């Protein structure tokens, strides 16, 4: 018999009552984990700049992070023409790759006794790789450009072309 004034809980209500504190603990643990990671990054950066950090509270960590992100955003607004870091890294890589290919070519042309056929093959391969890198970048650049559908002409659908030309479309079935 139930005690007067006491309600029975359904299984769902009991499940929620038990799991809510567990979920809250996990959420807090996750927040603290990322705050600790931010703290480590901030301390490393401040040590590299010669600043001594005695203690950082959670509010300090968040404040420094927000200030850093605002500074980065202002820097992007102030220099809109500066290439993104990925592009700078790609340009540096390409310049280093080209320099290395030049040095390989120089060695093959100046050191006697090296197989010229192998050297020619190697230089062709290096050239093909450099060309492929440039083509991949162009494809990525085209994919990132916004598409203006108003500027494009309407193309006929494949069915309209089939009707007008009488050609059959190959199908695997």
Curated annotation (Swiss-Prot):
SUPFAM superfamilies: HLH, helix-loop-helix DNA-binding domain, Orange domain-like. GO terms for cellular component: nucleus. Gene3D superfamilies: Helix-loop-helix DNA-binding domain (4.10.280.10). A motif (WRPW motif) lies at residues 170-173. Transcriptional repressor of genes that require a bHLH protein for their transcription. May serve as a transcriptional regulator of the Achaete-scute complex (AS-C) genes. Contributes to the neural-epidermal lineage decision during early neurogenesis. As part of the Notch signaling pathway, required to maintain the self-renewal and identity of type II neuroblasts by regulating the expression of the transcriptional repressor erm. Transcription repression requires formation of a complex with a corepressor protein (Groucho). This is Enhancer of split mdelta protein. Has a particular type of basic domain (presence of a helix-interrupting proline) that binds to the N-box (CACNAG), rather than the canonical E-box (CANNTG). The C-terminal WRPW motif is a transcriptional repression domain necessary for the interaction with Groucho, a transcriptional corepressor recruited to specific target DNA by Hairy-related proteins. Its main location: nucleus. One of its GO terms (biological process) is regulation of neuroblast proliferation. Residues 147-173 are annotated as: Disordered. GO terms for molecular function: protein dimerization activity; RNA polymerase II cis-regulatory region sequence-specific DNA binding; sequence-specific DNA binding; sequence-specific double-stranded DNA binding. It is found in: Nucleus. Residues 151-173 have a biased composition (Basic and acidic residues). Keywords: Developmental protein, Differentiation, DNA-binding, Neurogenesis, Notch signaling pathway, Nucleus, Transcription, Transcription regulation. Residues 93-126 form the Orange domain. Residues 15-72 form the bHLH domain. The gene is E(spl)mdelta-HLH. It comes from Drosophila melanogaster (Fruit fly). Disruption phenotype: RNAi-mediated knockdown of the protein in the type II neuroblasts lineage results in an increase in the number of type II neuroblasts. Simultaneous RNAi-mediated knockdown of the ETS protein pnt restores normal neuroblast numbers.
